[in-house]
Amino acid sequence: MHEASIALALIDVAGDVLREHGAARASALTVRVGQWSSVVPEALAAAFPACAEGTPLAGARLSIERVPGVGECPQHGPVELEVWRGLRCPLCGAPTPRLLQGDELELDQLELDQLELENL
């Protein structure tokens, strides 16, 4: 389960933001997880509380925003990809040579005590 190491990395990034803004702790964070990022959102949510224990994010609420995969079909342009099809257009079956979105793994929002920072 690599989600525990991902949770630790998110906690490190959030800790940097806390220090940068002189805040002692965060009460919530939002993470964007792409469908093609190889991250299991449920496993990340399960790992986060234990990883955050003893850090400024202990007790913080983790929200996970799932980002669908979108690929570029040579014939149909941007199409939403279905994992079970692989990187193929759902309309014609052609390979989608470029993933436009869906591989994200990013800290999007961090709520500090009485202060909210967006688009980190």
From Swiss-Prot:
Nucleus found in the keyword field: no
Pfam families membership: HypA (PF01155)
User: Which residues does the record give as Zn(2+) binding sites?
Assistant: C73, H76, C89, C92
Record's keyword annotation contains Zinc: yes
Instruction: Tell me the Gene3D superfamilies matching this sequence.
Output: 3.30.2320.80
GO biological process per UniProt: protein maturation; protein modification process
Coiled-coil positions? none
List GO molecular-function terms, semicolon-separated: nickel cation binding; zinc ion binding
Which domain of life does the UniProt lineage start with?
Answer: Bacteria
> In which residues is Ni(2+) bound?
H2
Alphabetical keyword list: Metal-binding, Nickel, Zinc
Q: Which PROSITE patterns match?
A: HYPA
Give each disulfide bond as a residue pair.
Answer: none
- Role played: Involved in the maturation of [NiFe] hydrogenases. Required for nickel insertion into the metal center of the hydrogenase.
List the PANTHER family. Answer: HYDROGENASE MATURATION FACTOR HYPA (PTHR34535:SF3)
The Swiss-Prot or TrEMBL record describes its family as follows: Belongs to the HypA/HybF family.
Protein name per its UniProtKB record: Hydrogenase maturation factor HypA
Q: Which organism is it from?
A: Deinococcus radiodurans (strain ATCC 13939 / DSM 20539 / JCM 16871 / CCUG 27074 / LMG 4051 / NBRC 15346 / NCIMB 9279 / VKM B-1422 / R1)
